Amino acid sequence: MDEEGAPLSESVQVVDPDVRAHVYSLVTALGGFNGESADRYVLGDDALACLRDIKRWLKLYDEKNNRMDVARCLGEANLVNGDLLPILTLWSTSGQKSKHMSRIALACLELLVPLTWPLEVPSKMTVNHHRHTPYLQQAQVLYKRGILSHGSDSILRTIIRIGLPSMAVPRSERTTRDEGILKLMLYFLRNIAVISPNARLAAEGDEEETSRSATINAFQNQDAFALLLTMCSNVGEDFSLQDVVLLEILFHIVKGVNVEKLFMNDAQRKAKRTDELGELLQKESSLRREYAKNAPTRHGRFGTMIWVKRDDAKVSTVSGQDVLKDSQTTLHKMDQSKKWNKPQIRRRAAEVTANNDFNTPVNLNSTATKNLRMFVEEFLDSGFNPLFTHVRKAIEREADRVLDINTRQFFYTVAWFLEAERVRRAHQREKRHLGDKSLNEIEPDSFALVASVLNQETFVFLNRSMQYSYDNKDVEDLTAEMRCFTQILLTVQEMAQSPLEEDQEIADNIQNRIFYEETTHDRIIAIVRGYKDQGFGYLDACTELAHVFLKMLEHYSKENVDMHIRSRRRAKRKAKQAKQADIEGDDEEQASEEEDLMDAERISKERKFDFKRFAAKFCNQSCVDTFIAFTKYYKELNVDQLKRAHRYFYRIAFKQEMSVLLFRLDIINLFYRMIKGPGALDSNKPIFKEWEELVRQIIRRMVKKIDQRPALITELLFSKINSTVFYLEYGHEKQTISASKRPPAELEVDPREAKTTDEKIKIVVHVMVKDEHTDLVKWVSDVLNSAADEREAWESQEQHSEGQKAPNPMIPVKSNNESCQKAMFSNAKLRLLMTLVRFERLGMEDVPGASWIVPSSLTSQDLRHTRSMIEQCLTEPVTESSDRDLSQLIRRKSGNNTRRDRDDQTADVDFGSDSEGDDNVPDGPLFPPNPRSRASALEQLKKQRKKRRKQAGEEEEPDEEDLEGRRRARLENALARQAKIKSDLYIHASDEQTDEEADQEFFRLEEQRRKEQAERIRKALLHGVVEEASENSRKKGSGRKRQSDQHTASTADSQSKRQRRQQRTGGLDDDDDLVMTGTDARSPDSLGQGSPSLQGANDVEDTPVTSEENELDFDDDLAFSRNRNRDKVLSAENDDSDTEPPAPDTIDEDDDDEAAPVAAPPRRRMRAGFVIESDSE
């Protein structure tokens, strides 16, 4: 029939009449109620055939043609409530033993499943779909009402009885038919749980008959919950293919149920509902008060229009009597009349379906609450671990029975049951605290009941799913995953507070694994930053996750001070650079670069965690905007959600000291309205006082900051970028220092393969040509050519000039483009070629952009010769033997590792210790040690090894006392050697600070010393008598003693050495230039005068001196050379008369290798009758 031409008085035929006639005839032939007994259903003669024909019509007409005509006809014919349910009742009462009736019952189940299948709104709906979908939705609600309340019979129990024979068969013996029957049974239960009244359609009858409470009560009364518990607890053994369907049933039963209310008793639940009702009434009264402030009055039925004169002398027109109240109301009315056509982002409308509606709350009656709580507790005790382990593995291996929607259902259901477990434990603790004797006798349960979702496999699966959903912008999946992650964190936090040590250890291990990965940290930050109109559910989930993660990570980092995390950023960046840097890629260099890359990866994979650094990543405008968008719902938020937003803003403003991010007009306006109104928070809420204090402190800081930074008045209109935040916070721009790049390793040509410079140049040129760097070689040739021309012109000009010849000027090396400029720094082979052609770099710093020159020492002929050689290498082909690669002849330059040299300069520096042993060092803090050279250290090590091998068979191993004595002796020797070393490492910048008074005193003392010195010199020149310069004159030895001879020295000898050392230490502040001693000097003048001061000087002359004297003597090149010959003669005469023979124990071991030879005391160095000695060792 033509629908467009149908008259208005006739009803439009929405279904083909032929289809309707065929379907109606099948329904009629199926059977009906007999007139004699109206309560008894009578089957037709071919009832089984009729049921199978109806099934074929559904499959071949509706599914094949993507239509809903047959389902519409069956709904209009009331097939389900009028035929199928009475047939199932008839089978359950009298026909279970009949095989024919069992087939008919199974055929009824095969029809019930597609007729109750949830209607999914496809993306491309046809006219047929739009026409039939609302009717079929209402029809399914009627189906559910009839199934749940069909007289005195239990339809759900009847359906379960149909599947029991297949359940009783062992898994290995089940046929395909048995698996199909189990699947039909579970899908029917799933459909009943999914069907719910459509809020946009008018409901027929009582809605309570099809509500969630009615469904839960029916599942409990008709043994559906017992069936689910049985199958969930054995899902891995007997029911491996039914795991996904069981997950769907659980999801649709528990979604939207408030867990807190579920575990309350009747009194607590009643008080909770009373509080909720009081809040709603108070909210309604506040709305009425706000409306009454501006509501029209009884006499305000006349129109009003006024002119408002603004500050700029312009006039605006405003209408309405409410503008007459005051000026503020008038301006507010003007603002409301303004319209801004803000461009809207065209987003695909999010379709709220049964699978992603997480946030719609569901209210249960008391009976349904008790039944569901009982089922949840039993499921947590027996079925949680087997079901979710099996489902996770099925999702990971992408089984055929798994759909995309099942991942979302898995994470949401896991999150719901984890929260239920935590709330159940909290109520048990509360009961135990109140004195429940039945609970006091029971030990606290461990968290092994939910351990299947707290293992490493689940964390890996969760992190991978979160990253995939975030990358693909799948909002619903990501919301479910964030809820699951949050509940896992809260469960682990409760495990850490468990009285069982095993749970505490497991919780610590889990936190370590979660917080160890920096990718998890970055993902959470990216999710919070990336919020943009994804809905309140997504906003609530991401803010809760960020709040819980931050709080737990802060607590964990405080307990574990040495916490480390694994970061992959630097490793990836370096790997990418290594792939792109093929300009430095010969074999040996590449191998060393790979070693450096591996080292960099090891360093970057694990680093010490800094919580302040991580928390600072939440201090940006994007995160603030996310929490501001969440706070805008403050009228609908509960106490926990308001506390969550309050803690974040408190952290931003006071813990991180980034309150500048909150100084924006819309944010300040929101905070003000929350406290002062209109539409303020309820002042009776416990969180109101905290918000009031926070807002007051933020506004106070903003006013104070405006006084300090007047530019903030303009910045109040805009979001803050990092540079603006830094300027407003500190008053100046942030100073950034760019990190300088390191130059490449210095290369060289193997000297065994190339002897001359020409051969080396040929090798380098050939290797660069092979590496496709011919343009750089040509550039070097061009630079040599231009430099030769310029140098040739300069030389010809010098030949014609007759004056003094000036040196050749240096010629700068200029790059022809930017890539060449970069290659001058980064290309190691180009730098080697430039070095071989004798280019030089100006300055000591090897940085990008450093200047290179052609030195003045190169003549034009040298430059021409070098260029001709390079050109010859470019023109002739590369001739190399097959067994030798020219690139292997270029290697890193040995012994020129600047990094190692730089490290060696400070490797052996000892800055002393805080231990008590350092107080005995005579020179105060220890100076850096004077290490032996590498060669001498190696030789000494070899000698010690040989000596050990010889003594290995002769001597026994030293005991602990000997080893301790040797160690103490080595330490004393090291301290004695270090105490004598002077270092310039302790010269500080503060030494250059001037002090006028100290300078004046210093110059006065210097002037006094000079006058006294001049007077002594004048008297000595006139009279030939040397006065006593100091009582603390020092003596020096002539021979160096070994350590083996120190223990044989006499007591008096060692005491005299100690006295002289103390005298030298005390005289360090004296003049360091020349010390003139007279009392103990053996000058001929003093001997001839017979000075009494020389009588006692001979007592200390007998001590043999060390060879340090000879090493420290400086050349006799002063102005007193006129007495040089005379000093030699006199000193030679006095050597025989004044030097006493040494002690016998010092000379009888001349042939022994370990005894040091004792040299005769050298002569005194005389200058005009004065003994010249150095006071430093």
From Swiss-Prot:
InterPro entries registered for this protein in UniProt: Timeless (IPR044998), Timeless_N (IPR006906)
Main location: nucleus
Acidic residues bias (residue ranges): 583-597, 911-921, 954-963, 1108-1118, 1146-1155
Record key words, sorted: Cell cycle, DNA damage, DNA repair, DNA replication inhibitor, Meiosis, Nucleus
Biological process annotations from GO: DNA repair; DNA replication checkpoint signaling; meiotic cell cycle; replication fork arrest
Gene Ontology molecular function terms on file: DNA binding
GO cellular component terms listed in the entry, alphabetical order: replication fork protection complex
Region annotation Disordered: where it falls in the sequence: 575-597, 791-815, 874-1001, 1021-1177
Pfam families named among the record's database cross-references: TIMELESS
Keyword Cell wall biogenesis/degradation annotated: no
Cellular compartment(s): Nucleus
Residue spans of biased composition, Polar residues class: 1086-1096
Subunit structure: Component of the fork protection complex (FPC) consisting of tof1 and csm3.
Descriptive protein name: Topoisomerase 1-associated factor 1
Species for this entry: Neosartorya fischeri (strain ATCC 1020 / DSM 3700 / CBS 544.65 / FGSC A1164 / JCM 1740 / NRRL 181 / WB 181)
